[in-house]
Amino acid sequence: MNIEDSCISCIDTDWSYQLARRMEKEKTNPVLGYRTAGSAAETATGDMLYREMKAIGLTDVTRDTFSLDGWEFEKAVLKFTDDDGQEHTFQMGGYQTNFETDGFEDYELVYLGKGTAADYEGINVKGKLVMVEINQRDEWWISFPVYQAYLRGAAALIAVQANGYGEIAESALNAQDIAGPDFAPAFSLSQADARILKRSLRNKISACEDNTTDSEDTHNTLEQDAALLRRSSLKVSLDARSRVIPDTTAGNITGKIQGTETDSMILLSAHYDSYFDGFQDDNAAVAMMLGIARSLVKGGYKPAHTLVFCAMAAEEWGIIDSKYDWSTGAYNQVFRVHPDWQGKVIADLNFELPAHAHNRQDAIRCTYEYADFIRQFTDSLTVPKEAYPDGITVLSPIETWSDDFSMAIAGIPSTVNDFSAGPFMQNYYHSQYDNQDVYQEAVYQFHHECYLKLIMAIDRLVLPPMNFSNTMNAVAESIHENALSFADPEQNVLLRNLQTITASAENIYDKICQINAEYALSLIHISE
């Protein structure tokens, strides 16, 4: 049995699955979960992962601390008694804003459609709760209606996902980074609970207008509802505690398998903060990363380059009032805690939502420069049909959704198992339905094996397999797409220069491949 087969035989996806479930233990909200930036729950989970890395046999295990803004979301419970005397209790999700009551406090609640400026015309919302329906995927982010409500004097905004996210069930809540100030509070309410409130508003208006309104009409458009239901309000009670903590600390947990030949590093990363239970996002990813580390140690692998395993804090959010408030832990790790990683880390393999098939075809998304090498690697794989019937492909460039972007802008070639284009995002992502029920063992097993093999493939290289001609071709394509933005002489000069650079980059990549092939051959001779 060769070393690759030996390590693969040590993969235990049940061990990884159980670790992912154990990560759910610590939570800021005892009902909904949440393991948020700088919170006690995140810190305790980091401590557990620190101990786990040591138990696996990783060396130089550290907690790399950094400054950020934290968030503790303990509860947001809305109570309402309808005209029949039935009391309803709604669990609401939270956003990274400040709002704290002294037990249940009474408020007026109004419904204002999409929460646009036009929806507020003629309505006094000062001190009230404003309920709106938004679609963050196709229209606008939560930050816009929240700030609109704040400017109008509302006590808080309650956002209902009309579509875009949380589509799996009408009871789904949603959470996202607020991308705004902490003093404009917001909460998340499910469509099912919002429907109860809207029905009561409709009944109240119907009674006041001598039954001229059809109280049973639930087929109105959002605009029709906004025009009708804004005429009245409801009495509700809210018990909430959401606290933003400026300038606190968090820690990225790192461990190593020391390299034997170079001071270069191969980085594996995944984040351990979460919304709700966060089983796929990103418990399963952290657990897979450590499951791979465990297999390499148990299998006796001695890497040429040092393997670094990093559980990142604060990926979901970590900065007050910023458009760039996510991937805080990764950004701090590579720019402030370990700027020395720039130039030493030859690849970052980042993991997100890896125990679920997001499409019939799997994909590794990577920076332009690594696309050729990754494609050559995927061509060598046998993909199990029960995991991905249509095999695997390679996509580039990377996107801004995940921590590999922070690594890439620091100059580290990065990859991630592609997750952003599938239906999981519209249905389960950042909702309480991201739990163990969406676990797919065949996918998880394949990803353990695939990325263990990719680590070894990269580790066998003496030079990073970077083909800059892909980058130059992408630049040229963007020029053609935006041709009218350039004067013709400037465009032609730029394109000619790009052709020259592209040819040079292809020659350099050919030489890199030649040297890597000769090095791989020498390793075979040594082993013999």
Task: List each model region and its residues.
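Acidic/histidine-rich catalytic neighborhood of metal-dependent amide-processing enzymes
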Residues: 137-148, 249-252, 274-369
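Noncatalytic luminal/extracellular "stalk/propeptide" segments of secretory-pathway proteins
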Residues: 10-14, 18-21, 25-126
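Extracellular/luminal Protease-associated
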Residues: 37, 90-188, 390-393
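Active-site-adjacent substrate-binding region
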Residues: 248, 353-478
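Soluble metallo-hydrolase cores and metallopeptidase-like ectodomains found primarily
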Residues: 4, 88-122, 178-280, 290-301
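Mature extracellular/periplasmic domains of secretome proteins
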Residues: 123-125, 145-155, 172-178, 330-340, ...
